[in-house]
């Protein structure tokens, strides 16, 4: 019996001697996360974008001028995927055997600046790389970005270099339905804005 008591006392002493080490370990604060790492996290705004990935059927409508009749192209396919915190969209015509990229864009919320950033490239028009930003945070269900002014080559054989302003509204109509509207304003002295381009997306 005395031997058993001695063994219990030794075990209890060992337990108590280890307890402060456990307590000290539990009390150690987690290492601080630097600002860059925090801002690289996807965040709620880009988390909403991640819900829009997948394949979408697109109807494209173009109005060349205010009051012009619409030109409609149906059955295009947009493929969306996340690239880091950005959503990438690639537009193709499934009837094209070469699977040519018609248009590509990227959209992301810049958590440092607190605004949306957007870039697009259209292989069907001589407009180069177009960049746009929002004024502020806005709403995830309706994002508005304003493009840097750019020039159209103009009609006919001679390059006229018609300057153009453009803003774009990206509207989440429903979980399976998006609309992207582009409004043009020509630098022609009228200041008239019109809906020039619409992409209507339905999730496949």
Placement of each model-derived feature along the sequence:
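Boundary at the C-terminal end of the N-terminal hydrophobic targeting segment
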Residues: 21-27
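Bacterial N-terminal signal peptides
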Residues: 9-19
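Residue-level recognition of beta-strand termini and adjacent short loop/turns
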Residues: 83, 172-176
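Edge beta-strand at a domain terminus
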Residues: 27-31, 177, 183-204
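Bacterial N-terminal signal peptides that target proteins for export
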Residues: 1-10
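N-terminal helix-cap/turn-to-beta initiation motif at the start of protein domains
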Residues: 40-57
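Central antiparallel beta-sheet cores of small beta-barrel/beta-sandwich binding domains
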Residues: 39, 58-165
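Short beta-strand segments and strand-loop junctions that repeat across beta-rich extracellular domains
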Residues: 51-52, 59-65, 109-110, 180-192
